[in-house]
């Protein structure tokens, strides 16, 4: 015999009706599964209540300071990264760095001076650190700020 879609039935006992409590003495009446007396029998206790011990939100320290809403965030590229990504040198701009996967699209780029640069590179970015500027010019390249 083949099973047909209209013959399917849920397993016995898997679809029990919702128990309605507090509706007469016959089943779950009177105290309605809450036990006898006490706060939990009479009203709802907040989920944050810890039984009188000092609550977690008061035990933790307050956050100091503030977060500057006008801070500009830069994607960081080191001089060593430029030397690794562009071993032949040439012109390096934000678009070239995005194409190589060094920075995300539509982001501000800051070049920092970590690493060594030996090839001549003309770098265009939004910001440069002092050491990065020195290394690029020492290698014979140029620095252009957007």
From Swiss-Prot:
It comes from the Bacteria. Coiled coil: none annotated. Residues 1-54 are annotated as: Disordered. InterPro entries: Ribosomal_uL15, Ribosomal_uL15/eL18, Ribosomal_uL15/eL18_sf, Ribosomal_uL15_bac-type, Ribosomal_uL15_CS. GO terms for cellular component: cytosolic large ribosomal subunit. GO terms for biological process: translation. PROSITE patterns: RIBOSOMAL_L15. Signal peptide: none annotated. One of its GO terms (molecular function) is rRNA binding. Keywords: Ribonucleoprotein, Ribosomal protein, RNA-binding, rRNA-binding. Binds to the 23S rRNA. Belongs to the universal ribosomal protein uL15 family. Part of the 50S ribosomal subunit. This is Large ribosomal subunit protein uL15.
